[in-house]
Amino acid sequence: MARGPKKHLKRVAAPKHWMLDKLTGVFAPRPSTGPHKLRECLPLIIFLRNRLKYALTGDEVKKICMQRFIKIDGKVRTDTTYPVGFMDVISIEKTGEHFRLVYDTKGRFAVHRITAEEAKYKLCKVRKTFVGTKAIPHLVTHDARTIRYPDPLIKMNDTIQIDLETGKITDFIKFDTGNMCMVTGGANLGRIGVITNREKHPGSFDVVHVKDANGNSFATRLSNIFVIGKGNKPWISLPRGKGIRLTIAEERDKRLAAKQNNG
């Protein structure tokens, strides 16, 4: 019987959003254990090699990491398979570039460049709040941070803004109708809109209705909702397309229009 952790990941079993082709090898990089789940993260090697094209091979990625050029959420990471996930800030000191991992409307991680000013903070969803030993209140975020003595107004499903230098909470957004959110799971992954209402289903999943900037409405589970702004003012810069998913016909029309303008 096999003992211990799994160390390999076959290429065909890798998450679809990594966009690895099936025929270039047998294995895929298995993400290390870390703050994000295997199916919801992007190993650092794939980000540097396949997305940014800063390296051609895994060996080159290792050389980049070992020179301590790559920071994730303000901390140097030398592990090439470190799991980078939603809302993480990747900074490359040498080139002065900063990226935030957010989903595009196709449900893949977009290469989203941000300013040095924006790279100083990140948003985290509150997964749970509890009172620990000696009656110390704690909260746990979506990226496995445990923060003690939070503001007593912060509850589950709210979003907190964390200063990456100190790890302290600087501000928070309540989970409320009328606030801007991004969908982080399910069929509507990557869509951005304003929360219109929440249906409570005791014993089952609460359903949240969201309306995007084009006026299209859709519904998803509460667990898939990540609040990113108060009202319709987002606290982070949004990726291209602003989280509005086009239908196939709209995409085609947009392509044709772009072709005619260029032609």
UniProtKB/Swiss-Prot annotation:
GO MF annotation list: RNA binding; rRNA binding; structural constituent of ribosome
Pfam families referenced in this protein's UniProt entry, alphabetically: 40S_S4_C, KOW, Ribosomal_S4e, RS4NT, S4
Residue ranges of every copy of the S4 RNA-binding domain listed in the record: 42-104
Keyword annotations from UniProtKB, A to Z: Acetylation, Cytoplasm, Isopeptide bond, Nucleus, Ribonucleoprotein, Ribosomal protein, RNA-binding, rRNA-binding, Ubl conjugation
Cross-link (Glycyl lysine isopeptide (Lys-Gly) (interchain with G-Cter in SUMO2)): K230
InterPro entries in the record: KOW, Rib_uL2_dom2, Ribosomal_eS4, Ribosomal_eS4_C, Ribosomal_eS4_central_region, Ribosomal_eS4_central_sf, Ribosomal_eS4_KOW, Ribosomal_eS4_N
Keyword Zinc: no
Example of a GO biological process term: translation
N6-acetyllysine modifications at: K233
Subcellular location: Cytoplasm; Nucleus, Nucleolus
GO cellular component, one term: ribosome
Family to which the UniProt record says this protein belongs: Belongs to the eukaryotic ribosomal protein eS4 family.
Known role: Component of the small ribosomal subunit. The ribosome is a large ribonucleoprotein complex responsible for the synthesis of proteins in the cell. Part of the small subunit (SSU) processome, first precursor of the small eukaryotic ribosomal subunit. During the assembly of the SSU processome in the nucleolus, many ribosome biogenesis factors, an RNA chaperone and ribosomal proteins associate with the nascent pre-rRNA and work in concert to generate RNA folding, modifications, rearrangements and cleavage as well as targeted degradation of pre-ribosomal RNA by the RNA exosome.
Protein name: Small ribosomal subunit protein eS4, X isoform
